């Protein structure tokens, strides 16, 4: 419960710092497509929407399908999903911080510095957290848990969360998969314990 309350506190602080958006930013590439899909005849002159729907399958297909049936046209419902995914993301990073920091206050400060002081400090706006519900937020929430389980050397949940992240945003899952696999191989080669490499999970 303490981790949940701490994650909720982080969410409240980040909301004050970054705000919350609906129908703007990257959501402008998703919501019109969903609306046009459910209301034939709308956005007929919009080349992006027409091309998106005509393409059938793309990197947002899974997220698009889920959001369509999870209340995309209800702002309050979209905010609830944003809240849940954000809290899950923060909890994962609190768990990661706990692997190297024993004091709860220092764990909180370490994670808070990532999501508050580190905002807009990455290359190409590739943030860990987004102030709107988009595929990258959902994928990075799952990928953060994958990273935690990888650090704990629990490879079954690691690969499960990676697969989920990959379905939600392929590049997020693929990038973390490559990084963790290479890191595992390098570490185990150095330690001369190649037999303990989780080949079955990697192949799956």
Predicted regions and their residues:
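Membrane-interface alpha helices of multi-pass inner-membrane proteins
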Residues: 147-149, 157-171, 180-181, 204
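Perimembrane helix-loop-helix junctions
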Residues: 176-204
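Active-site lumenal/periplasmic loops and adjacent helix-entry segments of GT-C-fold
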Residues: 12-113, 122-144, 167-172
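Membrane-interfacial segments
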Residues: 97-105, 154, 189-194
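Start-transfer (signal-anchor) and selected internal transmembrane alpha helices
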Residues: 1-13
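Hydrophobic transmembrane alpha-helices
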Residues: 90, 94, 98, 144-152, ...
